């Protein structure tokens, strides 16, 4: 796991050196808020005071921009989402018919999160392996992923709550995205 790899890096570092840990992309947004706190707290427990955690986060923006990014015109996100069913078919012996599902991106403005769903185009029964069957009604969805969007002050607050201080943030204003340098205290 990521934390196991971090523990190994800490064990290998030379005495007296600081550690720089990268968590790029916007993966932190894929954690439920309580899990994000737990994850950063776990990282902080592994790091020493003065070590640096560099994290990327997608920032809050207009709903239309978020939806456009996750329901893109070339269908890349839809293909990625449908690939989850293809993998379940391949790896778990399921019989999802991919053409019977449509990709949907929904933005929950209260939670500041985008949700990926696969909507059933028909009433259907799907077998997963030999022992499990799932009944889906037309219009029913499978919620496959969430991605929370942050404000810069959310990251600073999260840092303080988990034993870090946010020293600096770099923000791309064109497509609001932040790189934050958090120092373990």
Locations of regions flagged by a protein language model:
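Short SAM/SAH-binding signature in class I
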Residues: 16-26
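Core SAM-dependent methyltransferase catalytic element
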Residues: 120-121, 171-185
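A short, conserved alpha-helix within the catalytic core of class I
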Residues: 30-43
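A short linear hydrophobic-aromatic micro-motif
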Residues: 165-169
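S-adenosyl-L-methionine
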Residues: 1-15
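Conserved beta-strand signature within the Rossmann-like core of class I S-adenosyl-L-methionine
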Residues: 45-62
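Substrate-binding/catalytic lobe of Class I Rossmann-like enzymes that use SAM or dcSAM, i.e.
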Residues: 59, 65-164
């Amino acid at each position: 796991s990521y934390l196991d790899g971090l523990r190994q890096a800490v064990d290998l570092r030379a005495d007296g050196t600081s550690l720089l840990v990268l968590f790029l992309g916007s993966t932190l947004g894929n954690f439920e808020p309580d899990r994000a706190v737990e994850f950063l707290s776990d990282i902080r427990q592994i790091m020493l005071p003065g070590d640096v955690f560099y994290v990327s986060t997608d920032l809050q923006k207009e709903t239309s921009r978020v939806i456009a990014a996750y329901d893109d015109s070339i269908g890349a996100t839809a293909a990625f989402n449908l690939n989850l069913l293809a993998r379940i078919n391949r790896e778990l012996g399921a019989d999802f018919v991919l053409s019977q599902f449509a990709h949907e991106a929904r933005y929950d403005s209260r939670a500041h999160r985008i949700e990926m769903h696969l909507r059933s185009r028909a009433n259907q029964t799907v077998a997963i392996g030999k022992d499990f069957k799932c009944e889906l009604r037309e219009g029913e969805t499978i919620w496959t992923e969430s991605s929370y969007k942050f404000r810069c002050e959310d990251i600073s607050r999260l840092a303080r709550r988990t034993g870090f201080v946010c020293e600096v943030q770099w923000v791309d204003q064109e497509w609001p995205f932040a790189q934050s340098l958090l120092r373990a205290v």
